[in-house]
């Protein structure tokens, strides 16, 4: 499912809301989650999961094509840990 499909699904299930309002709400949610993660904060959605940022240390890597060793800088990457309710639902335990 892509963002536009999510917006359409929410708008269809809530006919009292205009699609442009739903789009604004969805975009605001994504902006807030992104902003919180950019600040290094954890975003937890109970039952669904938690978004956080993990630090990857600098390391020596290898170019798989040439075999040449390369220095890979330290970086921060997004991380998602599923919540118990989501995990159970995915495994047919709901």
From Swiss-Prot:
Entry-linked SMART domains: BHL (SM00411)
GO cellular component: chromosome; cytosol
InterPro entries, sorted: Hist_DNA-bd (IPR000119), Histone-like_DNA-bd_CS (IPR020816), IHF-like_DNA-bd_dom_sf (IPR010992), IHF_beta (IPR005685)
Keywords: DNA recombination, DNA-binding, Transcription, Transcription regulation, Translation regulation
Position of the signal peptide: none
GO MF annotation: an example: structural constituent of chromatin
Pfam families: Bac_DNA_binding (PF00216)
Residues forming coiled coils: none
Single GO BP term: regulation of DNA-templated transcription
Matches recorded under NCBIfam families: hip, PRK00199.1
Family statement drawn from the similarity comment of this UniProt entry: Belongs to the bacterial histone-like protein family.
Subunit-level organization: Heterodimer of an alpha and a beta chain.
Alphabetical list of HAMAP family matching this protein: IHF_beta (MF_00381)
Record's function text: This protein is one of the two subunits of integration host factor, a specific DNA-binding protein that functions in genetic recombination as well as in transcriptional and translational control.
Database matches in PANTHER family: DNA-BINDING PROTEIN HU, INTEGRATION HOST FACTOR SUBUNIT BETA
Protein name: Integration host factor subunit beta
């Amino acid at each position: 499912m892509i963002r536009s499909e999510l917006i359409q699904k929410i708008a269809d299930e809530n006919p009292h809301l205009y699609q442009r309002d739903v789009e604004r709400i969805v975009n605001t949610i994504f902006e807030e989650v992104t902003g919180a993660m950019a600040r290094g904060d954890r975003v937890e959605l109970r039952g669904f999961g938690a978004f956080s940022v993990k630090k990857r240390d600098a390391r020596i890597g290898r170019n798989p094509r040439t075999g040449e060793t390369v220095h890979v800088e330290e970086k921060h990457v997004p991380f998602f840990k599923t919540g118990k309710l989501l995990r159970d639902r995915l495994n047919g335990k709901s």
